[in-house]
Amino acid sequence: MSKFLVKAPAKINLFLHILGKNNNYHSLESLLVFVNIYDILEVTIDAPRSGVYFTNLKINRYNNTITKVIYLLSQHSTSSVNVFVSVIKNILVSAGLAGGSADAAAVMRLLGNVWDIQPQVLEELALEIGSDVPACLHSKTLFARGRGEDILLLPDLCLPKYIVIVAPKGKPLSTVKVFNNYEPSAFSSPICDNLPVRQDDWLELIYNARNDLLDTALKFVPEIEEILFVLRKFRNCLIARMTGSGATCFALFNELSDAEVVVRELQMTRPDWIVFNAKIL
């Protein structure tokens, strides 16, 4: 029996464009970053039994992204044994931060290494778990397109580092619900053939981009609009935007001190919001 402790970082979509829909899946383009907010997973390999335990949330223990990973990878390994995972959830659930996908990817990386499963196989299996899982396998700044499987890593992209994250308390938002109700008058045009090369061009793209799911999310959580309005008023806020399918929003800053001012003020004045700062990895 072997025990491992792994961390699963939260994801932020700096922008998210929807290009169309094929075979019931939306095609997208998104710039993703990962931040220093982590779920902590204790993974026991060759445990007395397989299973998943969430220490502080009522998440289905028998049908979740981690159980799916354990099952899928066991089918691709001759050395598979019982795996038990205990999860401390720090990433907000149903909030657009890819917590479930991050957990799945963390377990996938570990088991892939221990069971000697090739990275290409892991990437193919990741998409079966969820559209964010391939990106979470990397957990680095990247540009994703298609269903999320077409990934371009951007190791040299230097972005503003400090993020204030704000979510309305008690208002989870289902990704499936948002996508199922997404009915645009027109889809976004692709940018993948004209990706920026220079640093300044990437920053300009980020500033001028958007989250195409915002209007749909607002139908279910109108408070998102107020959060964005408040964030945009703060000094030196570069952008304020919703991440993923919501309802979490973020504001981007160059300086930690500016982000800390926002967090202090909102934690004092908005007890109805969850507010914390983070840093891009």
UniProtKB/Swiss-Prot annotation:
ATP binds at residues 92-102. Keywords: ATP-binding, Isoprene biosynthesis, Kinase, Nucleotide-binding, Transferase. GO terms for biological process: isopentenyl diphosphate biosynthetic process, methylerythritol 4-phosphate pathway; terpenoid biosynthetic process. It is an enzyme of class 2 (transferase). Coiled coil: none annotated. Pathway: Isoprenoid biosynthesis; isopentenyl diphosphate biosynthesis via DXP pathway; isopentenyl diphosphate from 1-deoxy-D-xylulose 5-phosphate: step 3/6. Its EC number is 2.7.1.148. The active site is at 11, 132. It catalyses: 4-CDP-2-C-methyl-D-erythritol + ATP = 4-CDP-2-C-methyl-D-erythritol 2-phosphate + ADP + H(+). GO terms for molecular function: 4-(cytidine 5'-diphospho)-2-C-methyl-D-erythritol kinase activity; ATP binding. Pfam families: GHMP_kinases_C (PF08544), GHMP_kinases_N (PF00288). Catalyzes the phosphorylation of the position 2 hydroxy group of 4-diphosphocytidyl-2C-methyl-D-erythritol. Belongs to the GHMP kinase family. IspE subfamily. This is 4-diphosphocytidyl-2-C-methyl-D-erythritol kinase. It comes from Ehrlichia ruminantium (strain Gardel). The gene is ispE.
